[in-house]
Amino acid sequence: ETTSPTPQPGQGNYKGEQPLVDGHDNWYSWAAENWGTKWDPEVHLEFTDNEDGTATIQGWFDSAWAPPIAAFESLSQDWDSCYIEMFYEESGMCFVGCWDSEGGDDYYEYSEATSKTITDIIPKYLVEQFALDERLAEYEEEEAEEENLQEIVD
């Protein structure tokens, strides 16, 4: 949140007129434009000095509904010598991707995929990153068990 800090809210946050902050009168539209998602993420990061004049920061975080691409774009503009690569997945909305500061966004939807067809839709590196084939196989197995139970009940 230090690269694009949340604006301080005015009094009466939910009623009446709000002060404009960077052209926004509410936290939601400000966050969506500046972070690319509605929440500031709870971040878990590890810093490693590569002992060659570079460093690596790795970690994970949860965000709401979308990867915070706008936040990473802002960070990469502030630190032009910084290369950023972000893998993301939203299992409830069935999308996955990889964004980097040099090549942009590699985004895929997989709502129609099965454990057998996922690699036809999604590149292997993303399937492996998130174990999509294994997770879909587990889901399919659970669905089959539920159907079998329903048939017994009926």
Residue ranges and their predicted role:
Residues 1-154:
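Intrinsic low-complexity, intrinsically disordered or marginally ordered coil/linker segments
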